[in-house]
Regions:
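Terminal recognition/anchoring or ligand-binding modules at protein termini
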Residues: 2-5, 23-70, 96-174
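Acidic helix-start/capping segments at beta-turn-to-alpha-helix junctions
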Residues: 72-91, 99-106
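Bacterial N-terminal signal peptides
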Residues: 9-20
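N-terminal processing/targeting junctions
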Residues: 14-16, 92, 165-169
Length: 174
């Protein structure tokens, strides 16, 4: 396990711990307290991850793993800048026109993950191209995503879990 994978797993663990601790607190913290938390912890607490969350965390992962320039300030980018960056890397489809606040569906996350990992599953996808549906099936088959409905919106903690598995898969490659 590399240092990067360990770091991402630690971030995920901290996020999940924060969710657990927050569930024990009777008075939810105010927006001011939440704004001081790391983005990964704030996202882990969300019942539904957004497209903006996914784009931000995938860009951070790509920067951490050297897929994009380490000097790139992904935290300072707006949604359209993140979209352009991920589109340039081939992680998102050019036809996507999502609202940043839209819920992140499992099949969309699977497409991003399969593209990030450069997964080329089979004959049909080599002919017709990668789709969100087949990406989701392939990510499930590889154990990178859990079973569920493809159009179901993922939680923040599920988003972090999938990204951690992606990081581990990427780091285990020669």
């Amino acid at each position: 396990m590399t240092t990067r994978t360990f770091g991402l797993m630690a971030i995920t663990a901290c996020g999940l711990l924060a969710v657990t601790l927050a569930a024990d607190v009777q008075d939810p913290p105010g927006e001011e307290a939440d704004s001081k938390l790391p983005a990964s912890v704030r996202i882990a607490r969300q019942r539904q991850a957004t497209m903006a969350d996914a784009y931000l965390l995938v860009a951070r992962l790509a920067r951490t793993q050297g897929r994009i320039d380490a000097e790139t300030d992904v935290a300072g980018m707006d949604f359209e800048e993140l979209r352009a960056l991920l589109l340039e890397q081939g992680f998102v489809a050019g036809s996507w026109n999502f609202d940043p606040a839209a819920g992140l569906e499992r099949d969309t996350l699977a497409y991003i993950g399969a593209s990030y990992l450069d997964i080329k599953p089979g004959l049909l996808t080599s002919i017709f191209g990668m789709t969100r549906r087949y990406s989701y099936r392939e990510m499930q088959h590889r154990g990178l995503m859990v079973q569920g409905q493809p159009r179901q919106v993922v939680s923040g903690s599920e988003l972090l879990s999938v990204l951690t598995r992606m990081a581990s898969e990427f780091d285990s490659r020669p």
